């Protein structure tokens, strides 16, 4: 991805309220078109398009810290989703870590651990309507929350801590989550995370996640487990997933993935998927086919779905 950078000395004071010699502005973007379909399910027009442009600015303070801000202008398939997303302000304090405030968007650290198995396309349960998925996130619609990151405490160790304050309305209590990742052994990645979501009052959701990924030559294998434990009488879900990817060349990758959702009071949802992706410069072609048994825990409800994608980065 090519990034155009422009020195903007005159705008440094306007971008951040600190003393800085110069600010650096970068603009990146992307666009994609896709087609998806399903068996035993009416999906209507399967064609979709997405695009977005990200504006970022950064400057170095007199004490050596770096301050940056970023925002995404994106357009999805519905007019209600048009606008600015992922607005953030980050203070990088060097060995003391970095603190990011998300005015809108962002991803809680545990949300990125929902299924970490290697794939050339999508997770095994994706592209099938009503299939149970996992995507834990801090409450309040991902607005006005904090994330702290530090990778300097120990070689190969990165920690992330999330805090979402209560808003006195939909979120009566604050929500917290955190993860730790270890990459100190060549090719091996280990991760663990936990969190508490109090944004669904009076119900609370406790989340825990563990994963391991190992890459050797052209092969990458991964295992992931993710559990949601709700204070309600039902609704607990545990995901266990495995995946294997193979880099046929520098440009072509293929993968197979399997996932099982254990749903409290329902049948287990079992998913199996195959994916492939081909990268040619800034263009990526992707394809995947997934089959899901007992969709959403409903016994005998079996469906499959597929997706084709073409994306460009600039």
Named regions from a protein language model:
Residues 1-314:
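Outer-membrane beta-barrel proteins
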């Amino acid at each position: 991805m090519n990034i155009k950078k422009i020195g903007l000395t005159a705008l440094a004071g306007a971008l951040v309220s600190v003393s800085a010699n110069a600010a650096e502005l970068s603009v990146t973007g992307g666009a994609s078109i896709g087609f998806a379909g399903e068996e035993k399910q009416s999906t209507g027009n399967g064609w979709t398009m997405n695009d977005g442009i990200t504006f970022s600015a950064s400057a170095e303070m007199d004490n050596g810290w770096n301050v940056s801000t970023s925002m995404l202008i994106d357009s999805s398939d519905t007019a209600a989703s048009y606008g600015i997303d992922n607005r953030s302000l980050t203070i990088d304090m060097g060995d003391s870590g970095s603190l990011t405030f998300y005015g809108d968007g962002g991803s809680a650290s545990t949300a990125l651990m929902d299924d970490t198995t290697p794939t050339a396309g999508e997770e095994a349960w994706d592209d099938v309507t009503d299939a149970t998925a996992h995507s834990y996130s801090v409450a309040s619609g991902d607005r006005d929350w904090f994330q702290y990151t530090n990778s300097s405490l120990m070689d190969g160790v990165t920690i992330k801590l999330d805090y979402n304050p209560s808003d006195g309305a939909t979120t009566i209590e604050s929500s917290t989550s955190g993860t730790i990742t270890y990459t100190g052994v060549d090719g091996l990645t280990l991760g663990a995370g936990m969190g508490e979501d109090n944004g669904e009052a009076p119900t609370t959701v406790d989340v825990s996640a563990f994963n391991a990924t190992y890459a050797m030559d052209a092969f990458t294998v991964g295992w992931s487990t993710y559990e949601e434990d709700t204070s309600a009488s039902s609704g607990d879900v545990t995901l266990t997933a495995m995946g294997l990817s193979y880099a046929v060349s520098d440009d072509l990758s293929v993968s197979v993935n399997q996932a099982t959702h254990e749903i409290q009071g329902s049948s287990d949802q079992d998913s199996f998927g195959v994916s492939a992706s081909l990268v040619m410069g800034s263009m990526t072609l992707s394809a995947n086919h997934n089959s899901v048994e007992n969709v959403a825990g409903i016994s005998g409800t079996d469906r499959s779905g597929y997706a084709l994608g073409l994306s460009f980065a600039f």
